[in-house]
Amino acid sequence: MIALIQRVSQARVTVDGRTTGEIGAGLLALVCAERGDTEAQAERLLAKLLSYRVFSDAEGRMNLPVQNMDGQGNAGGLLVVSQFTLAADTNSGTRPSFTPAAAPEDGRRLYDHFVTRARAAHPSVQTGEFGAMMQVSLTNDGPVTFWLRVPPAANA
């Protein structure tokens, strides 16, 4: 399972002109399930994402996670957006192949599991809409962007 995370000062996702999720300072996580992923990969990825230290401490070092982004126990927002294109195979030709991505029904199940677990573990979780054409706007803080991946069990 893959997450492209971006530290943001604000982010919003809309579908058909309707805002489905919006956060202030925190993380925007574009999330993708790969073939062979299970709930175990989703949970490992979420644990890594929530504890990944990308916010600055008092000395200006990236040393704080989204769950304690100000160093005083205050959590930042988490906006989770499904994006199957993260699994694209771009190794040959000029058109991406999405064969590595999970089938839509598996992707939805794993995305829903990821979001459910995120809401249980983090106080401020917003989402996009799985499978919808979305418009995502953000102000990247830094910019700070990281690629996190927990490989499918068969490829681990």
From Swiss-Prot:
> Does the record's keyword annotation contain Signal?
no
Compartment(s) where it occurs, according to its Swiss-Prot or TrEMBL record: Cytoplasm
A Pfam family that this protein carries is Tyr_Deacylase
Task: Give TM regions.
Answer: none
Matching entries from SUPFAM superfamilies are given as: DTD-like
Gene3D superfamilies to which the protein is assigned, alphabetical: D-tyrosyl-tRNA(Tyr) deacylase
Q: Give the Enzyme Commission number.
A: 3.1.1.96
Location of motif Gly-cisPro motif, important for rejection of L-amino acids in this chain is 142-143
Its annotated function is as follows: An aminoacyl-tRNA editing enzyme that deacylates mischarged D-aminoacyl-tRNAs. Also deacylates mischarged glycyl-tRNA(Ala), protecting cells against glycine mischarging by AlaRS. Acts via tRNA-based rather than protein-based catalysis; rejects L-amino acids rather than detecting D-amino acids in the active site. By recycling D-aminoacyl-tRNA to D-amino acids and free tRNA molecules, this enzyme counteracts the toxicity associated with the formation of D-aminoacyl-tRNA entities in vivo and helps enforce protein L-homochirality.
Entry's family note = Belongs to the DTD family.
This protein's assembly is summarised as: Homodimer.
Question: What does UniProt say about this protein's domains?
Answer: A Gly-cisPro motif from one monomer fits into the active site of the other monomer to allow specific chiral rejection of L-amino acids.
Q: What is this protein called?
A: D-aminoacyl-tRNA deacylase
Q: What is the lineage of its organism?
A: Bacteria, Pseudomonadati, Pseudomonadota, Betaproteobacteria, Burkholderiales
